[in-house]
Amino acid sequence: MGMVLHLEGRVLDLNGKPVDGALVEIWQCDAQGIYDHPRQSGRDKRDSAFQGYGRMLAKTDGRYSFRTLKPVAYAGRSPHIHFKVATATGRLLTSQFYIGGEPGNDRDGVFRGIRDPRQRELIEMRLAPAPGKEAGALATTMDIVVG
């Protein structure tokens, strides 16, 4: 098992108001860089104790939270967590969160495709120790804006 990460934040509209009831989904590879996907090579080596995905409805204040693993790199990609948000009004956003300052980000084709540094900041997780959680756990807060 990898390092525990507590990922939380809010789903907001373009005016900064919370989006109630948005469906938030995340998925990622395990601590060995293996996805739970039928076409994933090396799938027999996957950590069967790690689900690899989660989904929840954002609360009235737009809040969501997941207990997952700190993402790891795999061939051609820097550490990241995929996410998708669907709102009751039909808005859909699919993107990825990256670890801020990760040296591999500059070699990741998807990350490099985001040329505006201000937009990159919106998807860069700042990881910090998670006080009051399990020993060694990390935490980050990532608000998601859908418009």
Where are these regions (language model features)?
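Beta-strand-dominated extracellular/periplasmic modules and repeats
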Residues: 1-147
